[in-house]
Amino acid sequence: MNSYQTNTATSWGRNHIPTLLDNLTTAAMFMFCPFIILVFYLITYGEYLGSIGDFYLDIINGDWQTIWSNIPSFKINVLGACLLWIVFQLILSKLPDTIHRFVPHYVGGIKAGHITPAGNLVYYNINGLQAFIITHVLVIMSCYYGLFSPTIIMDNWGSIFWSVNIIGYLITFLAYFKALTFSSHPSDNKFTGKLFYDIVMGIEFNPEIFGTDLKLFFNGRPGIIAWNLINLSCAMKQYENFGYVSNSMILVIILQLIYIVDFFYNENWYVHTVDIAHDHFGWMLAWGDTVWLPFGYTLQAGYLMNNPIDLSTGFFNLVFVMGIIGYIIFRTANYQKDKYRSNTQGVKYIPCTYQTADGLNRASKLIYSGLWGVSRHMNYTGDIILSTAYCLACGFSHFIPYFYCVYMTILLVTRCLRDEQRCSRKYGKYWKMYTKRVPYRFIPGIY
């Protein structure tokens, strides 16, 4: 029995033994996913103006000259700027949090995370909301005083594509070799010996460099803070090109800003989610957070930048209300779960135990109160509704802005299944009792 099998036999963490197909699949993702983002870039920001059909016709007709003319160029100074952006966010992540002193109910400062499968407890400096505010104040002031243009991101978006890909792969290889040579928490490592699987899915659970947890940092700081700045740059570029900002652009920015601010306001809650509490840090997170997130999650604003859509008042209100309903479901479910962890008075739950790899039995509870008694993943249901609202704001002329809600639905359904497999291993008979009490995953009576 190899070390990986030995480790997984007593651990409720990741225990999948990859097959040849798994290794080939992860190898394909590792090598070809950047080209998917490049295609998104060409269709959304090139002369195709969001038309997948026109792009497809150029491929069929062999018009490679037109396609090639839309491929962005690489600029070394843009790579330097992207690296400085990450360093700047790293500096902000090290500052002590002060926002919790002024913002009601906000939890900031040094806080404990989730107990890892090997029994380690990691602490995080929760100051994302502070970093978000400082960054936006500095960027807005810099634009106001003319230090750089408010369209600077979109003016260099093509070069940024190449730069963040380089950075994403550099971080991936750093994480891989760090895990092999000086792991922060070796007992939580999952090394399978399958090269691409280990690189893509990650070996280390909580890699730290200079006291900073790379998983939380890259999950939240460079990409999600940039998300809103990218949207704002798209809006300013739309204004520059057309002389106004469409109400559809405003709607997308508002709905996504609500989601972004919610993420940072509830960063202390986020450290207990799947991304932080269960996933290992490899290419999937390193490249995903530096490339997939900023380019995939901003497709709506990018599409509207070149295709201004003026929504009717009725449709605007309908999409806005839909987005708010989705957000309320998402936030209420997560709030209830977080609240019930600390105060179980009047809460319906199944008391249970689980064992970590160090052999200790630990107490926990499976809650079926509130929305968690309606379905097992109502937070995901709300997330999908909100994601769909972003896309509906872009009208119905082209499919490309709808990629996001399709992707999020697939992501959250597969994540739901992974969650439940993990919970079944972790809680055993208690999980079976829970699924009998709450039989539906997303939508009561349907699924």
Swiss-Prot record:
Q: GO CC terms on record?
A: membrane
Q: Which Gene3D superfamilies match?
A: 1.20.120.1630
Biochemical pathway: Steroid biosynthesis; cholesterol biosynthesis
Q: Where are the transmembrane segments?
A: 24-44, 71-91, 102-124, 133-153, 157-177, 244-264, 281-301, 309-329, 393-413
Question: Its membrane topology, per UniProt?
Answer: Multi-pass membrane protein
Q: Which EC number(s) does UniProt give? A: 1.3.1.21
* Keyword Transmembrane included in the entry's annotation: yes
Provide the primary localization: membrane
Please list the GO terms describing molecular function: 7-dehydrocholesterol reductase activity; NADP binding
Keywords annotated in UniProt: Cholesterol biosynthesis, Cholesterol metabolism, Lipid biosynthesis, Lipid metabolism, Membrane, NADP, Oxidoreductase, Steroid biosynthesis, Steroid metabolism, Sterol biosynthesis, Sterol metabolism, Transmembrane, Transmembrane helix
What is catalyzed by this enzyme?
A: cholesterol + NADP(+) = 7-dehydrocholesterol + NADPH + H(+)
Domain of life here?
Viruses
Q: What does this protein do?
A: Catalyzes the last step of the cholesterol synthesis pathway, which transforms cholesta-5,7-dien-3beta-ol (7-dehydrocholesterol,7-DHC) into cholesterol by reducing the C7-C8 double bond of its sterol core.
**PANTHER family xrefs:** 7-DEHYDROCHOLESTEROL REDUCTASE, DELTA(14)-STEROL REDUCTASE
Q: Which family does it belong to?
A: Belongs to the ERG4/ERG24 family.
Its protein name is Probable 7-dehydrocholesterol reductase
